[in-house]
Amino acid sequence: MANHKSSIKRIRQTIVRSERNRFYRTRLKNIVKDVRSAITAGNKEEAASAMGVANKQIQKFVSKGVLKKETAARKISRLHRAVNAI
């Protein structure tokens, strides 16, 4: 266990941030899954609307520091390419 007040606080902060990031990462996986399922169903309108939601949320996760901007750009690019291939 930590002995210093500052390290105890850091541990507390890490726990809170880890929980928050886990929530965001789970949400990201579900959003991407929605887009992928619309693509496999062949429903272009549903895939396009899900892509709009995914794009907005992925950019929000970048601003919150959950994702790096390069990772987000790669995810968005791959999803757009898959939607356009329908």
From Swiss-Prot:
Any one GO MF annotation of this record: small ribosomal subunit rRNA binding
GO CC field: cytosol; small ribosomal subunit
Keywords per UniProt: Ribonucleoprotein, Ribosomal protein, RNA-binding, rRNA-binding
Keyword RNA-binding attached: yes
InterPro entries in UniProt: Ribosomal_bS20 (IPR002583), Ribosomal_bS20_sf (IPR036510)
Pfam families, sorted: Ribosomal_S20p
Coiled-coil ranges per UniProt: none
One BP term from GO: translation
SUPFAM superfamilies reported for this sequence: Ribosomal protein S20
Family: Belongs to the bacterial ribosomal protein bS20 family.
Function per UniProt: Binds directly to 16S ribosomal RNA.
Protein name (Swiss-Prot/TrEMBL): Small ribosomal subunit protein bS20
Gene designation: rpsT
